[in-house]
Design a protein with these regions (language model features):
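Charged, gly/pro-rich active-site loop segments
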Residues: 1, 73-140
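Extreme N-terminal tail/first-helix region
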Residues: 1-16, 72
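Short secondary-structure boundary/capping segments
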Residues: 7-8, 32, 52, 68, ...
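Structured helix-beta-strand junction loops
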Residues: 12-13, 56-57, 129
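Short beta-strand segments
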Residues: 13-46, 54, 62-65, 74-76
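A short, aromatic/hydrophobic, helix- or strand-capping loop or linear motif
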Residues: 20-22, 64-67, 110-119
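Short, surface-exposed beta-strand-loop junctions and turns on beta-sheet-rich folds
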Residues: 48-50, 69, 140
Length: 140
């Protein structure tokens, strides 16, 4: 995919799979995400296994894919280190760098302009160092 196609694809999709690594091996979970300004934003429960694993080792691989039949398959793998942004868990403190991602995430998933803070989730940011994408619709 071109950069523009990748941006459009990641903006439209809703669920990604996040791979982390821990003492007992790989761990794979599905999460909602936001792609904004070439940055992947994830919100995670702070008591989740993935949170503890990312605290120990911030490296992650994220997969977003779509399509059912072979000729429809497309997707992207993003690899990089995850950063923890804002308070954990998130309670709504003023964190300027979260203002735009929270607004866009709230619109995408809840149809509102303001993020609800439940005191269980917190933000993760990945600025991928590697992106591999594919679009099998272009093959034929």
């Amino acid at each position: 995919m071109s950069e523009a196609e990748l941006d459009e694809f990641l903006a439209a999709e809703r669920t990604c799979r996040v791979a982390t690594s821990g003492p007992d091996g790989p761990h794979l979970t599905a999460l909602w995400f936001l792609w904004h300004d070439r940055t992947l934003w994830l919100t995670s429960i702070t008591r989740a296994k993935r949170w503890a694993q990312l605290k120990r080792d911030p490296q992650a691989s994220v997969l977003v894919d779509a399509g059912h039949d072979y000729g429809e398959l497309r997707g992207a793998e993003l690899r990089g280190d995850v950063e923890f942004v804002g308070e954990a868990p998130r309670t709504g403190e003023n964190v300027p760098e979260l203002a735009e991602p929270e607004k866009l995430f709230a619109r995408k998933y809840f149809g509102v302009d303001q993020m609800f803070h439940d005191g269980r989730h917190a933000w993760l940011r990945m600025r991928p160092h590697t992106v591999v994408s594919w679009d099998f619709r272009k093959l034929g």
